[in-house]
């Protein structure tokens, strides 16, 4: 789906407990962020809670239900999705007012920084996960496509919601399970209003380089030299020991 239209960022709330920006003489240990926004012309929004940089939950606007990042969280807490939907409705109304007051000024586009990495050290034919980390961008609208050997891949892909940053920009993670091989190459293609053209980040298996023959020869020669030196030194000590023993025998007992 191509990105089109002029984005207007809606009501964006960041509620920080014991924030470092506050003038209180208290050193924060943990930070909870409530982030919500509404976008036009997409008519889409998001409501989520973040704890120390990790998502706790978000509300699925289409299904009207709370989605916990980890199922275990839902066993110890609860959140009514209707509360988030009511907030988004207020955000939409506020956006209409703010848009008129700003004379329909669009939001400034900040292009993302994109990094592709693996979830764990890579071993051939061992299951792994490619991670496409999209960071430091606004507005929170991106299209992300995984490519294997230049062709789109959709099987098994997953993603996070838009995660807030302390500088009011956003970050997002996209995941692709895969089996590393020497034949396949991968790309994460990112589209955003701040980019003149789609941004591709490439990944392929990089086998460890074997030691060059000259290096192996040097290592072998060094090992041989060390071995010869050890033999020579050992022989010298043996000869000295024998000489001392013979001298003691010639002197006889006192």
Swiss-Prot record:
Residues 26-109 are annotated as: Alpha-1. Pfam families: C1-set (PF07654), MHC_II_alpha (PF00993). Changing residue 76 to W: Increases the interaction with HLA-DM complex and peptide exchange. Ubiquitinated by MARCHF1 or MARCHF8 at Lys-244 leading to down-regulation of MHCII. When associated with ubiquitination of the beta chain at 'Lys-254', the down-regulation of MHCII may be highly effective. One of its GO terms (biological process) is positive regulation of T cell mediated cytotoxicity. Disulfide bonds join 132-188. Residues 110-203 are annotated as: Alpha-2. There is a cross-link at residue 244 (Glycyl lysine isopeptide (Lys-Gly) (interchain with G-Cter in ubiquitin)). GO terms for cellular component: autolysosome membrane; cell surface; clathrin-coated endocytic vesicle membrane; early endosome membrane; endocytic vesicle membrane; ER to Golgi transport vesicle membrane; extracellular exosome; Golgi membrane. GO terms for molecular function: MHC class II protein complex binding; MHC class II receptor activity; peptide antigen binding; polysaccharide binding; T cell receptor binding. Changing residue 125 to A: Impairs the interaction with HLA-DM complex and peptide exchange. Residues 204-216 are annotated as: Connecting peptide. The record marks 80, 94 as: Pathogen-derived peptide antigen. The chain crosses the membrane at residues 217-239. It is a single-pass type I membrane protein. Heterotrimer that consists of an alpha chain HLA-DRA, a beta chain HLA-DRB and a peptide (peptide-MHCII). Newly synthesized alpha and beta chains forms a heterodimer (MHCII) that associates with the CD74/invariant chain (Ii) in the endoplasmic reticulum (ER). Ii is a trimer composed of three subunits and each subunit interacts with one MHCII dimer, blocking the peptide-binding cleft. As a result, MHCII molecules cannot bind peptides present in the ER. (Microbial infection) Interacts with Epstein-Barr virus BZLF2/gp42. Belongs to the MHC class II family. This is HLA class II histocompatibility antigen, DR alpha chain. It comes from Homo sapiens (Human). The lineage of its organism: Eukaryota, Metazoa, Chordata, Craniata, Vertebrata.
């Amino acid at each position: 789906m191509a990105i089109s239209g002029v984005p207007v960022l809606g009501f964006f709330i960041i509620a920080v407990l014991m924030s470092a920006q506050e003038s209180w003489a208290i050193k924060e240990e943990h930070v909870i962020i409530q982030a919500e926004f509404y976008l036009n012309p997409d008519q889409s929004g998001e409501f989520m809670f973040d704890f120390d940089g990790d998502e706790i939950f978000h509300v699925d606007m289409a299904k009207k239900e709370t989605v916990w990042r980890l199922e275990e969280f839902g066993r110890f807490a609860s959140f009514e999705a209707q509360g988030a939907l009511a907030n988004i409705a207020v955000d939409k109304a506020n956006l209409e007012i703010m848009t008129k007051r700003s004379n329909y000024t669009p939001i400034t586009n900040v292009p993302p920084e994109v990094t592709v990495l693996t979830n764990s050290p890579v071993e051939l034919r061992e299951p792994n996960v490619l991670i496409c980390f999209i960071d430091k961008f606004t507005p929170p609208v991106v299209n992300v496509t995984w490519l294997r050997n230049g062709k789109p891949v959709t099987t098994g892909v997953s993603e996070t919601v838009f995660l807030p940053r302390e500088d009011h920009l956003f970050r997002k993670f996209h995941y692709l399970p895969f089996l590393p091989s020497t034949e396949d190459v991968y790309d994460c293609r990112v589209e955003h209003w701040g980019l003149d053209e789609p941004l591709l980040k490439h990944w392929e298996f990089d086998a460890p380089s074997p030691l060059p023959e000259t290096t192996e020869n040097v290592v072998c020669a060094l090992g041989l030299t060390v071995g010869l030196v050890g033999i020579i030194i050992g022989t010298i000590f043996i000869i000295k020991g024998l000489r001392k023993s013979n001298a003691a025998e010639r002197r006889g007992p006192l």
